[in-house]
Amino acid sequence: MISLPGLTIAAGRPEWAGKIIRTFAQYLDQGMLPNVFPEVGEKPEYNTVDAILWYFEAIRAYYAATEDQTLIRQIFPALVDVIEWHQRGTRYNIHLDEDGLLYAGVPGAQLTWMDAKIGDWVVTPRMGKPIEINALWYNALQIMAQLAQVVGQPQEDYIRLATQTHRGFQRYWQQEKGYCVDVLDGPEGDDDSLRPNQIFAVALPYGDLAGPPLLSAQQQQAVVDTCSRSLLTSYGLRSLAPDHPDYQGSYGGDSLQRDSVYHQGTTWGWLIGPFVQAHLRVYQDSDQALSFLQPMADHLHNHSMGSLSEIFEGNAPFRPRGCIAQAWTVAEVLRVWQVLQRHTHHSSPSPLIR
């Protein structure tokens, strides 16, 4: 779902996006999408909290590109069901808490994109209320309010839920540190590790839709500046700040060694997309935002044959690691490049169509 807007819509193939959205709708179950599709005779696996939330963003991007009301009318009842499942609770203790924030997780499960697991060891446990999950949830509620308007259905419930989430989201902000908590209400309390997930609280388009941004303008700038100082490398954002005691800046060794550092300092290429979009939103400087993509262009020509790598080491010279052709990375570079092109030419359609 993260890759869908970039690999289809930004690449000039929105009809593919529509087909994929329809196909995935057939696999919705208890308000969730599978992260592993079945082989013949097997069942899909549902162990991700964010896939369904990225599905909403993919739908928003598709409608922005096509204004295909037919598809929206077909899938809208299923989207209503998704929201209701999250309100009452679904697998893995995923549920909407009283503070308006989504809680997700049970011991031994890895439900976010930071999903490395070795045997029974979850390397990056994020049980609780991960920040990007709640930024995505707020985004989904704003999208639902807009889509309800498209199909002529009431939007008040989604606006009410979004207002609750906005209020609860203020708990993430740490004034004394100038950045956001990564996970609230975990088994051992809040996790204030400096990780890149907070960039989605600035980058996602919810502020352009029905409700206010989750963070103030000053807070957004602080998040972007903090990520620039501590997480930004030539090819993306580090998964953990270098001054954290668990930081690992090199990636190598056997599978155990590699998985143990996968999200503990390794640079992820796909995160360059939300970072560039967040930077553009805060500073409105398309030339500077575009400059962040230049190393990826160099990498495209000098390292891989027509594609972009999955990850890079957290320490200079940021050697490429992982798979040499990663859909997330390619998709996010394409998507944010298109965003920059539109910004440069000042083509700004209606709020939902961005």
Predicted regions located by residue number:
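Aromatic-rich carbohydrate-recognition surfaces in CAZymes
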Residues: 4-111, 130-134, 138, 266-280, ...
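Alpha-helical positions within canonical tetratricopeptide repeat
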Residues: 15-16, 71, 78, 154-157, ...
